[in-house]
Amino acid sequence: MARVTVEDCLEHVDNRFELTLVAARRARQLASGAAPEVEPGRDKNTVIALREVAAGKVSRAILDEQMPPPLPNFPGAANREATGAEDAAGE
């Protein structure tokens, strides 16, 4: 898939707001070391996440999963743990 469109992704999620949440959560997982479900090529995590949604490999169910703690060498991990900050989804 050369280019991902919102329409491709909306076949697998209910609306564009949910698409934003699903893609953001998946991009965070990829940044934390999760294995991509599609060929990553030279794409950034956000594009890979959208390609996974468009391919039907990632769905709304990802929002129900607990996010693992960030890797120690992940940027901002020390700040997040020190402040007890929650992720953007409010979990």
Swiss-Prot record:
<dbReference type="GO" id="GO:0000428">
    <property type="term" value="C:DNA-directed RNA polymerase complex"/>
</dbReference>
<dbReference type="InterPro" id="IPR006110">
    <property type="entry name" value="Pol_omega/Rpo6/RPB6"/>
</dbReference>
<comment type="similarity">
    <text>Belongs to the RNA polymerase subunit omega family.</text>
</comment>
<dbReference type="GO" id="GO:0003899">
    <property type="term" value="F:DNA-directed RNA polymerase activity"/>
</dbReference>
<keyword id="KW-0808">Transferase</keyword>
<keyword id="KW-0804">Transcription</keyword>
<comment type="function">
    <text>Promotes RNA polymerase assembly. Latches the N- and C-terminal regions of the beta' subunit thereby facilitating its interaction with the beta and alpha subunits.</text>
</comment>
<keyword id="KW-0240">DNA-directed RNA polymerase</keyword>
<keyword id="KW-0548">Nucleotidyltransferase</keyword>
<protein>
    <recommendedName>
        <fullName>DNA-directed RNA polymerase subunit omega</fullName>
        <ecNumber>2.7.7.6</ecNumber>
    </recommendedName>
</protein>
<dbReference type="GO" id="GO:0006351">
    <property type="term" value="P:DNA-templated transcription"/>
</dbReference>
<dbReference type="InterPro" id="IPR036161">
    <property type="entry name" value="RPB6/omega-like_sf"/>
</dbReference>
<dbReference type="GO" id="GO:0003677">
    <property type="term" value="F:DNA binding"/>
</dbReference>
<dbReference type="Pfam" id="PF01192">
    <property type="entry name" value="RNA_pol_Rpb6"/>
</dbReference>
<dbReference type="InterPro" id="IPR003716">
    <property type="entry name" value="DNA-dir_RNA_pol_omega"/>
</dbReference>
<feature type="region of interest" description="Disordered">
    <location>
        <begin position="66"/>
        <end position="91"/>
    </location>
</feature>
<comment type="subunit">
    <text>The RNAP catalytic core consists of 2 alpha, 1 beta, 1 beta' and 1 omega subunit. When a sigma factor is associated with the core the holoenzyme is formed, which can initiate transcription.</text>
</comment>
